[in-house]
């Protein structure tokens, strides 16, 4: 009987193994490309970070990425989110990594899993848990036994989770590549010989995990074998792998840029982004990933920096809420379709490059069956008229023309035929003003007068070491006794604090002295305010506030946070200055604020504390206050936002779930923006910035899954700086207007994102000019009324498609042979 059971079990295991092998995918590489089941592939990937959206959003985001022409989704794995306390793991909700990978698989796409576990990503502390920093003798990202043990433990856990669910391609899953470490080549020189030894250890450790697919290391020249090195940046056309047997791969094509509090809004044109992609494939690239394809939202306190905003929109092809960012999404989709059609020549063809002069080159990829060509003009100012294979081509400055058959131009990166969608905020049907209740941050007086804390230490301690990043807030409290005989005593005294707190609030004897906010990245500063002291005991309470922990740079984990001192009382007696250093005094430390500790934002806890919420005398501009209001969820399925204009700084919760930090009172500089953006020339994060002199972030994403469709919802605010909640409003995000520019002999497609096209505001066929919202007819017009033509085709429809031709819009002899274009603006 036992033998029979053994034989049946053995047969079952053999069948399972055979089934797994039959469905497995062999992923490898050669010098040209990643190979899948022995075939070289063009792979088009996009970054979607699972914790920066909700699990309900994942299918739609992935579907839109697929519709946009991607075949691969890339994500980091966020260590501090999954292991907030040592050996205590969280893979629930939007941290359900397995579910995310399976959602990718269900869509028929591949996945790239960047385990790191250092991620940078403008994520708090670069993805490292702060408890790791607080372990004895700890140093990150170098030969350090404690760090290496913890890194290997987490990496192994993630790998085993993927293996248990058969998610690697070698098991029949979607994961075709995995990444160990991240951009270490940018900092390796700071670590000396130990840096080289560490990266070798990373490679050996990763390779020992036997995942059955290749490992990559981004920004890692001369990566240890068998790791594949890759490129990150705005452009990687000039990149060449150090290892001649490695393919040319681009793991981060930055589609825009992130925002800092106090910073302007970044914008990278569709023309320039498409140019960077086409140039990369023209010069031999075969794998390209958009960072980000969907940026999303830094919910809760996950934003890093310091000073990274709650919005992580990144000007990506899918905006923060999951809408198509047009024309970027559509312009890239057209390019992706062509690149996929050219896959065989690009991966197997012989390559020849022809210099056509004045920074223009033609590249021919040729097989026996097919040839495909690119004509690239990297001149940032001059258009080019070139003759190639006996035909003339007009190639605008800073653009690439794509010729799938080496004869007819099918696409040019500078000629955008895709619509531009103007996203607007639509007011909801709710009453304009919410009915608020409020309460102060209770027992604050106990803290600032008595110095009652959680920890007592002699001297000043770094904020990370005390809080373990459990809170943005840490009280530093001490007492000092003064009498008339004290040498420092005078009528003119001040408090001087050398600080690395991102925001500092100071109290002396229960009185608020003032605050200091870091501006222009000057995180090491001196705070000094005049104070009124008394004979006897004086109480000092300093509230240090962090706004995201540093996430990048060599040894960034040891960068100071909080009040590092010295802290001094300064007495001025005529020309004489006398200082009393309090840095080595006994200090009391209190982690967090009482409202946070009692979870006033929680739906379970908020109504059960002994202090009631008040409905009377709603205060404005009151520091350290809590506000709460009920509201109904906006109707429909459009994304929901909350307008926090009028508030100062703090955190906001919807039904107990944090949607992030807010700071609408922090405006960007009045300088550095441009009214018109020239796509030509190299892009940088400051180029084409807009929204100068405006709040860095005014609107905050409220995921639909956070809301109750029926009944009441609750918004809770903690206001740190003082603001007016009466101006807070909920709105939905909709496509308000759509514009399009299309060259003759192309098609124009218009869509209002599931809303009907209601009217044609402008249409002209000929030589119109201007930008969306300010189009103007030119000197040459088609014979037919373009507005009527477009209205007949489009009004009342969710979308419409038209051929742009003289036959459709009428010819006009006055236009001559000059190229004609159609400009259209419709209302939704």
UniProtKB/Swiss-Prot annotation:
SUEL-type lectin domain mapped to chain residues: 742-828
GO cellular component, one term: apoplast
Top-level taxon: Eukaryota
Gene3D superfamilies cross-referenced by the UniProt entry: 2.60.120.740, Galactose-binding domain-like (2.60.120.260), Glycosidases (3.20.20.80)
GO biological process: carbohydrate metabolic process
Residues of the signal peptide: 1-20
One term of GO molecular function: carbohydrate binding
Family named by the database record: Belongs to the glycosyl hydrolase 35 family.
Chemical reaction(s) catalysed: Hydrolysis of terminal non-reducing beta-D-galactose residues in beta-D-galactosides
Subcellular location as annotated: Secreted, Extracellular space, Apoplast
Full protein name: Beta-galactosidase
Organism: Brassica oleracea
Active site as annotated: 183 (proton donor), 252 (nucleophile)
Residue positions the entry lists as glycosylated: 23, 153, 253, 350, 379, 492, 667, 799, 803
InterPro entries, per the entry: BetaGal_gal-bd, Galactose-bd-like_sf, GHD, Gly_Hdrlase_35_cat, Glyco_hydro_35_CS, Glycoside_Hdrlase_35, Glycoside_hydrolase_SF, Lectin_gal-bd_dom
Swiss-Prot/TrEMBL keywords: Apoplast, Glycoprotein, Glycosidase, Hydrolase, Secreted, Signal
Keyword Isomerase: no
Enzyme Commission code: 3.2.1.23
């Amino acid at each position: 009987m036992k033998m029979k059971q053994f034989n049946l079990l053995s047969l079952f295991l053999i069948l399972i193994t055979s089934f797994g092998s039959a469905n497995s995918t062999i992923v490898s590489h050669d010098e040209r490309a990643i190979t899948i089941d022995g075939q070289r592939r063009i792979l088009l990937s996009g970054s979607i970070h699972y914790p920066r959206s909700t699990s309900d959003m994942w299918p739609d985001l992935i579907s839109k990425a697929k519709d946009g022409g991607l075949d691969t989704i890339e994500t980091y794995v966020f260590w501090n989110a999954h292991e907030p306390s040592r050996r205590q793991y969280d893979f629930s909700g939007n941290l359900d990594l397995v579910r995310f990978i399976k959602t990718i698989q269900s869509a028929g796409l591949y996945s790239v899993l960047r385990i790191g576990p250092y991620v940078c990503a403008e994520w708090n502390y670069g993805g490292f848990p702060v408890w790791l920093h607080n372990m004895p003798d700890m140093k990150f990202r170098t030969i350090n036994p404690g760090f290496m043990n913890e890194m290997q433990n987490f990496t192994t856990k993630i790998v085993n989770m993927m293996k248990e669910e058969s998610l690697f391609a070698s098991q029949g899953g979607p994961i075709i590549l995995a990444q160990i470490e991240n951009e270490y080549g940018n900092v390796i020189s700071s670590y000396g010989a130990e840096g080289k030894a560490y990266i070798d250890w990373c490679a050996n450790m990763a390779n020992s995990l036997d995942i059955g697919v290749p490992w990559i290391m981004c920004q890692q020249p001369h990566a240890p074998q068998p790791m594949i090195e890759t490129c990150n940046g705005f452009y990687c056309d000039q990149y060449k792998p150090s290892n001649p047997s490695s393919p040319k791969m681009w793991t981060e094509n930055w589609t825009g840029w992130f925002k800092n509090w106090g910073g302007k809004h970044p914008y990278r044109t569709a023309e320039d982004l498409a140019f960077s992609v086409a140039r990369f494939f023209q010069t031999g690239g075969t794998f390209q990933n958009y960072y980000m394809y969907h940026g999303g939202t830094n919910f809760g306190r996950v934003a890093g920096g310091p000073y990274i905003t709650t919005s992580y929109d990144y000007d990506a092809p899918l905006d923060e809420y999951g809408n198509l960012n047009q024309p970027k999404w559509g312009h890239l989709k057209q390019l992706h379709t062509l690149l996929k059609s050219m896959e065989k020549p690009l991966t197997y063809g012989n390559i020849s490059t022809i210099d056509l002069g004045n920074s223009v080159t033609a590249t021919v990829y040729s097989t026996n069956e097919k040839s495909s060509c690119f004509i690239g003009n990297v001149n940032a100012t001059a258009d080019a008229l070139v003759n190639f294979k006996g035909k003339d081509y007009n190639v605008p400055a800073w653009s690439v023309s794509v010729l799938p058959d080496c004869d007819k131009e099918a696409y040019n990166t500078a000629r955008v035929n895709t619509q531009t969608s103007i996203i607007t905020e639509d007011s909801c049907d709710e009453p304009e003003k919410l009915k608020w209740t409020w309460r102060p941050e209770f027992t604050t007086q106990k803290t600032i007068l008595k110095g009652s804390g959680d920890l007592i230490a002699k001297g000043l301690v770094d904020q990370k070491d005390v809080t373990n990043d459990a809170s943005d807030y840490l009280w530093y409290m001490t007492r000092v006794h003064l009498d008339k005989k004290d040498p420092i005593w005078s009528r003119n005294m001040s408090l001087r604090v050398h600080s690395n707190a991102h925001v500092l609030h100071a109290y002396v004897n229960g009185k608020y002295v003032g605050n200091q906010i870091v501006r222009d990245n000057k995180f090491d500063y001196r705070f000094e305010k005049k104070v009124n002291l008394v004979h006897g005991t004086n109480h000092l309470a300093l509230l240090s506030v962090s706004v995201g922990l540093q996430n990048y740079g060599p040894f960034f984990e040891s960068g100071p946070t909080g009040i590092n001192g010295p802290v001094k009382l300064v007495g001025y007696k005529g020309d004489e200055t006398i200082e009393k250093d309090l840095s080595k005094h006994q200090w009391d430390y209190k982690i967090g604020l009482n409202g946070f500790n009692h979870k006033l934002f929680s739906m379970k806890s908020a109504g059960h504390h002994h202090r009631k919420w008040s409905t009377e005398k709603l205060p404005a501009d009151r520091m350290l206050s809590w506000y709460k209001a009920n509201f109904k969820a906006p109707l429909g399925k459009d994304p929901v936002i909350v307008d926090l204009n009028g508030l100062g700084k703090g955190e906001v919760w919807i039904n107990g779930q944090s949607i992030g930090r807010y700071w609408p009172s922090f405006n960007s500089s009045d300088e550095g923006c441009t009214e018109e953006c020239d796509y030509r020339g190299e892009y940088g994060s400051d180029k084409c910035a807009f929204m100068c002199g405006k709040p860095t972030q005014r609107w905050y994403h409220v995921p639909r899954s956070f809301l109750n469709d029926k009944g009441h919802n609750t918004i809770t605010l903690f206001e740190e700086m003082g603001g007016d909640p009466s101006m807070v409003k909920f709105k939905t995000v909709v496509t308000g207007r759509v514009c399009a520019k299309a060259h003759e002999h192309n098609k124009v497609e218009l869509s209002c994102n599931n809303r009907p096209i209601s009217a044609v505001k402008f249409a002209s066929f000929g030589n119109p000019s201007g930008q969306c919202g300010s189009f103007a007819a030119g000197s040459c017009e088609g014979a037919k009324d373009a507005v009527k033509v477009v209205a007949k085709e489009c009004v009342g429809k969710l979308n419409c498609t038209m051929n742009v031709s003289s036959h459709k819009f009428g010819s006009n002899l006055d236009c001559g042979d000059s190229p004609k274009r159609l400009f259209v603006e419709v209302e939704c």
